[in-house]
């Protein structure tokens, strides 16, 4: 039986999961301040105890590679590397945008928040029933102001469960003309913690928005694929995909 540890720390939500036999069997999450540094390792320890297994029983550790929060990604990758080093397990990295696409394809339950074509997570309506089959899924990670990290994925396959990335992952400043060429072709689902702020700017009948955080549970499908294909990272040299170079600034506040 395949067992995976999944770690997602790229946004304000810190989440971790254990998968066994292709099913999520344990899950933890927190959006509390500084949860990434204080809870990631705790979550993993709790879940291993809950399942009655040890790290040596797991086949690999999977972590979000970004883009996303510099601090969050650093904590997640450091934790994953530590687990892999300690137990001699392979490291799998899954892109944050790929996780959001998988999350959309899981048909997570969402409902209206009262504004046109905008949805937020709850227990009422399934995404495909709400918007029909989307032609494109456009995951968005918030990058402050009106900027997001994003890419466009085209949906293919008879069941609509095959997504192909057709643009490079890149930062984008959102305005009323953003993604116009894709909106003219069919329904587009904008999903992620950067999607909600775009709803007031991108006005189009084919534009649908789901404001949510990427979750460790949604990493399972791409993680299993990477495990089966033996697409592992070099534990010693792997670094997160920050996309933007992190720049440390000196506070202008007087220290004394």
Predicted regions and their residues:
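N-terminal beta-alpha supersecondary unit
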Residues: 1-65
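DPxDG-like acidic metal-binding loop motif
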Residues: 63-96
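Surface "functional belts" at beta-alpha junctions
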Residues: 23, 90-214, 247-248
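Acyltransferase
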Residues: 209-256
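Conserved hydrophobic/aromatic positions in well-ordered beta-strands
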Residues: 17, 149-153, 241
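Residues at secondary-structure transition points
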Residues: 31-39, 70, 74, 78, ...
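Stable alpha-helical structural segments in soluble proteins, enriched in small hydrophobic residues
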Residues: 47-51, 86, 104, 216-227
């Amino acid at each position: 039986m395949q067992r995976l540890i999944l770690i997602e720390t790229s946004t304000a939500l810190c989440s971790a999961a254990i998968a066994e036999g292709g099913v999520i069997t344990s899950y933890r999450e927190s959006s509390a301040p500084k949860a990434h540094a204080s809870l990631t390792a705790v979550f993993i320890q709790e879940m291993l105890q809950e399942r009655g297994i040890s790290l040596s029983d797991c086949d690999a550790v999977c972590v979000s590679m970004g883009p996303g929060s510099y601090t969050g990604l650093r904590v997640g990758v450091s934790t994953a590397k530590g687990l892999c080093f300690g137990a001699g397990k392979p490291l799998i990295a899954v892109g944050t945008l790929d996780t959001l696409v998988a999350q959309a394809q899981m048909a997570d339950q969402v409902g209206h928040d009262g504004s046109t074509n905008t949805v937020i997570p709850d227990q009422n309506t399934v995404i495909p029933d709400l918007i029909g089959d989307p032609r494109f899924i456009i995951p968005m990670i918030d990058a402050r102001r009106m900027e997001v990290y994003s890419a466009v994925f085209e949906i293919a396959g008879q069941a609509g469960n095959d997504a192909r990335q057709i643009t490079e992952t890149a930062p984008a400043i959102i305005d009323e003309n953003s993604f116009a060429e894709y909106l003219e072709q069919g329904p587009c689902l904008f999903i992620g913690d950067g999607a909600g702020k775009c709803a007031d700017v991108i006005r189009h009948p084919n534009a649908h928005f789901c404001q949510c955080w990427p979750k460790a549970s949604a990493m399972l499908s791409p993680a299993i694929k990477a495990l089966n294909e033996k697409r592992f990272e070099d534990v010693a040299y792997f670094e997160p995909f920050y996309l933007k170079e992190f720049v440390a600034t000196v506070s202008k506040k007087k220290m004394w």
